[in-house]
């Protein structure tokens, strides 16, 4: 009988400790965010990933993603960086070397190794909150940017979050079909920003135009904004283009308008 009672107490305490352990794991897991990349395009893309200075590694800086494919990453608390799609890539099966038609990062490899996208490219940008370590900075910030031009449609969706707008953002319109001739890249595989096309300070928000009061939307950025109202169309397009959420996970979808 004594043995039975002791065994019951041990079982009870084991259950309590197990509960506390898994609860602690849940709290640890809530730091950072899971970011999933989905390719709904009818063609293969090679996503590029650039972590900002001081941010941790999330496992890769570039990879191949076939139509219908997906891949997830755990971005740690306080991570910031960007994602984009490289298209028209050709990598040698023996050497691994090659280049991409749009979004190329100049590494000459599938991995971008700390290099960013060469414009034009549609960008998804994130700053993940610091979590419980710093409650003042717990919110995530995210956006889809056309400041460096456009190459593929993109959507960013937040799931499971709170304490913010947590809205879906992106550009589902095929801007390559609406691209002005003077902004067209190559045979029409991408659309340059006015800054990339002309290099003028008023388009690049640089020099005397490096402030929100001086740099205003141009006729070209308005074309982007009209087609994709929640995306950044020029450098100071913050008010309608940056979104926040807390404790969320995110899905980046390339070519989201195609059937699932």
From Swiss-Prot:
PROSITE patterns: THAUMATIN_2. CDD domains: TLP-PA. Keywords: Disulfide bond, Pathogenesis-related protein, Plant defense, Signal. SUPFAM superfamilies: Osmotin, thaumatin-like protein. GO terms for biological process: defense response; response to bacterium; response to ethylene. Disruption phenotype: Normal induced systemic resistance (ISR) mediated by P.fluorescens WCS417r toward the pathogenic bacteria P.syringae pv. tomato DC3000. Disulfide bonds join 41-255, 89-100, 105-112, 166-245, 171-228, 179-191, 195-204, 205-215. It comes from the Eukaryota. Induction: Accumulates locally in the root vascular bundle upon P.fluorescens WCS417r and P.putida WCS358r bacteria root colonization prior to induced systemic resistance (ISR) and after ethylene treatment (e.g. ACC). Expressed only in roots. Residues 1-32 form the signal peptide. InterPro entries: Osmotin/thaumatin-like_sf (IPR037176), Thaumatin (IPR001938). Involved in local responses of roots to colonization by non-pathogenic plant growth-promoting rhizobacteria (PGPR) fluorescent Pseudomonas spp., but seems to not being required for the establishment of subsequent induced systemic resistance (ISR). Belongs to the thaumatin family. PANTHER family: OS03G0233200 PROTEIN (PTHR31048). This is Thaumatin-like protein 1.
């Amino acid at each position: 009988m004594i043995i039975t009672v002791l065994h019951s107490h041990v079982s009870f305490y084991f259950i309590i400790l197990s509960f506390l352990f898994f609860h602690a794991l849940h709290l640890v897991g809530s730091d950072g965010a899971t970011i999933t990349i989905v390719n709904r395009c009818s063609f293969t893309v090679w996503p590029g990933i650039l972590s900002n200075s001081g941010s941790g590694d999330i496992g890769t800086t570039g990879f191949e993603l076939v139509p219908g494919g997906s891949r997830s990453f755990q971005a740690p608390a306080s991570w910031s960086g960007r994602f984009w799609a490289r298209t028209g890539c050709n990598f040698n099966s023996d050497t691994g070397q090659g280049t991409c038609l749009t979004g190329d990062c100049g590494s000459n490899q599938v991995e971008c190794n700390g290099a960013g996208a060469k414009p034009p490219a549609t960008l998804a940008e994130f700053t993940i909150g610091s979590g419980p370590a710093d409650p003042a900075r717990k919110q995530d910030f995210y956006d889809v940017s056309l400041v460096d031009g456009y190459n593929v449609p993109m959507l960013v969706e937040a799931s499971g979050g709170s304490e913010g707008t947590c809205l879906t953002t992106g550009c589902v319109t095929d801007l390559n079909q609406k691209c002005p001739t003077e902004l067209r890249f190559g045979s029409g595989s991408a659309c340059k920003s006015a800054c990339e096309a002309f290099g003028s300070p008023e388009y690049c928000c640089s020099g005397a135009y490096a402030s929100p009061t001086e740099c205003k939307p141009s006729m070209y950025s308005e074309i982007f904004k009209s087609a994709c109202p929640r995306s950044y169309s020029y450098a100071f397009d913050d008010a309608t283009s940056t979104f926040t959420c807390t404790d969320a996970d995110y899905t980046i979808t390339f070519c989201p308008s195609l059937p699932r």
